[in-house]
């Protein structure tokens, strides 16, 4: 297969974003110690951090023994539970603080960011257990509907929680919005091959994170680890997957959509052209990334209201 020409696929704004990102978090960051990876990742996130919108109130709280951060802009019956990205190795409440604050301000919903424990200090299923424990406690605290959301590793956790909650927490999850999630798709298929060496994330990077997360050989057939390894995709909440064209994980959104539709559910996959993994941070530098963030917030807002966001489909 011919290698993609990223000089053509990516516009000047995305290249400028990637150069800025690489100043803090270099392409070979996985070769650093875990401590150093976290340090440079945190510096990168701080460099891109935007001022919180007016009116958003934040409070660090604990749910189910897991540290969380709550964002509110007024009373709301809907709670968005957000799981941050970072390969299960880096990231936390501060890395995605501005993203959560903006979702809160623009949707009007309560947003709770979950600071699940990271690998290698806690290996699988530790991160999932934290994600699900926080979900259960949040669902017990707030009586209204819940929208699950997350990016990259956090998209994996959001989907894993949705799968595990079936038959256990009934009628509460109004939808899930997964942003360039890693769901455990076929590594010999689609974007895994076509964009194996994409800027910002490569399949080699992914293999590193999988080894660290699992503490060795990744488990097989466990949807808590890889939601696409489930054998039953019925009964899942309405699902919107938004991925980046130039990302080895993009095909996971398509595969997951197809599995849910085949099981009779509602699902939508949008592949954003000319974007790369991690583009949420580019939303103030790139018109394409900003437009995608608009779609992400639109999907969350619609699902929370009980609507299907059909208007999000790209023209």
Q: For each predicted feature, which ranges?
A:
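Short beta-strand-to-loop junctions in surface cap/lid or active-site-entrance loops
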Residues: 65-78, 228-233
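Short beta-strand element of the alpha/beta-hydrolase
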Residues: 77-86
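Catalytic nucleophile-loop/oxyanion-hole region of alpha/beta-hydrolase
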Residues: 92-93, 99, 112-145, 283-289
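A short, Lys/Arg-enriched amphipathic alpha-helix followed by its capping loop at the start of a domain
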Residues: 102-109
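Gly/Ala-rich beta-loop-alpha elbow adjacent to hydrolase catalytic centers
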Residues: 150, 154, 158
């Amino acid at each position: 297969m011919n290698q993609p020409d990223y000089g053509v696929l990516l516009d000047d704004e995305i290249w400028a974003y990637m150069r800025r990102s690489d100043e803090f978090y270099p392409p070979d960051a996985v070769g650093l110690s875990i401590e150093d990876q976290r340090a440079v990742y945190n510096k990168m996130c701080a460099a891109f951090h935007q001022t919180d919108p007016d009116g958003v109130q934040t409070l660090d709280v604990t749910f189910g023994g897991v540290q969380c951060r709550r964002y509110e802009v007024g009373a709301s019956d809907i709670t968005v539970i957000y799981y941050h990205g970072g390969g299960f190795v880096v990231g936390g409440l501060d890395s995605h603080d501005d993203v959560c604050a903006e979702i809160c301000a623009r949707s009007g919903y309560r947003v709770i960011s979950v600071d699940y424990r990271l690998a290698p200090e806690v290996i699988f299923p530790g991160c999932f257990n934290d994600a699900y424990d926080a979900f259960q406690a949040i669902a017990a605290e707030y009586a209204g509907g819940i929208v699950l959301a997350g990016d990259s590793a956090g998209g994996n956790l959001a989907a894993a929680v949705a799968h595990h909650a079936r038959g256990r927490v009934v009628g509460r999850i109004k939808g899930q919005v997964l942003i360039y999630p890693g769901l455990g798709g076929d590594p010999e298929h689609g974007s895994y091959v076509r964009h194996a060496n994409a800027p910002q994330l490569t399949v080699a990077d992914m293999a590193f994170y999988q080894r660290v997360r699992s503490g060795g050989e990744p488990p097989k057939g466990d949807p808590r680890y890889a939601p696409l390894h489930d054998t039953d995709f019925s009964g899942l909440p309405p699902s919107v997957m938004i991925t980046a064209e130039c990302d080895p994980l993009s095909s996971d959104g398509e595969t997951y959509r197809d599995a849910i539709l085949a099981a009779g559910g509602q699902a939508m996959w949008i592949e954003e052209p000319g974007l790369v993994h991690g583009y949420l941070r580019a939303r103030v530098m790139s018109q394409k990334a900003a437009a995608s963030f608009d779609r992400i917030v639109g999907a969350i807002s619609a699902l929370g209201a009980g609507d299907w966001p059909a208007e999000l489909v790209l023209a």
